Amino acid sequence: MKYEIIHINRFDYETPVDQSMNSIRLEPKTDECQRLLVYHTEITPHSLTSHYTDIWGNTVESFYIAEPHTHLEVKTTSVVSIQRSPFVDQLTYSKAMQDIFSSQLFRDQYLPFLSQTNYTYLEPHQVTNVKNEIGDIQNPVQFAKSLMNYLYAHFTYDSNSTNVNTTAREAIELKSGVCQDIAHTMIGVLRAQGIPARYVSGYLYVGEDSALVGDAASHAWVEFMAPGIGWISLDPTNNVEALENHIRVGVGRDYGDVSPVQGVYRGGNQNLDVSVSVTLLDS
């Protein structure tokens, strides 16, 4: 599958601002299943960008605007090619996987993705309630799949019930939210079970005939570490393995590590308008 993504963030300010310092994480990844073919950034007012790779392996572009301005527009255009086949249902929990999963080396290696954050932390009784529902499952792959099924069945997708600061422990009580909330909740339970899990930000191609649900502007899903296999992507918002409709941009411990646009400025209030289009170029 080949896609073109056009992502526009426009900030309008009540009064002229200056000394605007910003960073963006909008460049899709290149990995074993996804290839970035084209990527460029347009910034208005014009500004040059510098690039670096953060601790999680995400590409970050930073820029500085010194002149007074009443609006800021960041437009990125990307073309990506994805070839990703389903395989999670084919995995068996071998003796080798069990040995790796129970080893201290495995725990130490993935400690950042076993440690809870404010976004992902769940109260012990909340974790217990979920585990009682899905059963005592020792196989981490099967546990992750069953957890995804549970969250899909019990959460209602509602963009009005939560906001960008909502935590997993709040969302699980509401049993509603958006992809960010459902992903944080799944990550929180996985980590409580001793399964390394990370947050994935990106784009979702829903198409005209797709049953997939999500906001193309900022879809999120989960990756968990299968011992001896690698990271496996699951989308609990849609109860599917994340495959060719899912375009990976950033990974981290939670949303805070992959926020698409971050910045500071001196001036008045702002209004943000986001526009995203994901177009299928070749299937």
Task: List each language-model region with its residue ranges.
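Secondary-structure boundary elements
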Residues: 105-177, 185, 193, 253-255, ...
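Intrinsically disordered, low-complexity N-terminal segments that are enriched in acidic
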Residues: 1-86, 93, 98
